[in-house]
From Swiss-Prot:
GO terms for biological process: fatty acid biosynthetic process. Its EC number is 2.7.8.7. GO terms for cellular component: cytoplasm. GO terms for molecular function: holo-[acyl-carrier-protein] synthase activity; magnesium ion binding. The gene is acpS. Transfers the 4'-phosphopantetheine moiety from coenzyme A to a Ser of acyl-carrier-protein. It comes from the Bacteria. Belongs to the P-Pant transferase superfamily. AcpS family. InterPro entries: 4-PPantetheinyl_Trfase_dom (IPR008278), 4-PPantetheinyl_Trfase_dom_sf (IPR037143), ACPS (IPR002582), Ppantetheine-prot_Trfase_dom (IPR004568). Keywords: Cytoplasm, Fatty acid biosynthesis, Fatty acid metabolism, Lipid biosynthesis, Lipid metabolism, Magnesium, Metal-binding, Transferase. It catalyses: apo-[ACP] + CoA = holo-[ACP] + adenosine 3',5'-bisphosphate + H(+). It holds the Pfam family ACPS. This is Holo-[acyl-carrier-protein] synthase. Its cofactor is Mg(2+).
Amino acid sequence: MIHGIGIDLIEIDRIKKAFEKQKDKLVKRILTQEEEQQFHSFKSEKRKLEFLSGRFATKEAFSKALGTGLGKTVAFKDINCYNDIKGKPCIDYNGFIVHVSITHTEHYAMSQVLLEKRD
């Protein structure tokens, strides 16, 4: 049974400006330790910003699908988005099957999340 659907679109330039001011502080606020390792594995700043923007959008979309938004119930660090063996983005969250799609262009990153309740 579908619990919720969430979508988020963010300008990569918005994340870039925040990253230029906050650097690792922003990365540590948004990404889990596993995600942070992947972030630091990228060579180019462009790819790092695409990744950070995509994960930001995914976590926002997830919180919308959950119906709570980010804050008291769920925080950025509570949501770990990883890639499976084929590169598909995945989130494990207790009690739910989570479907994730992330895309980006030169200027935007977008993510859609669908939550299904486990039987």
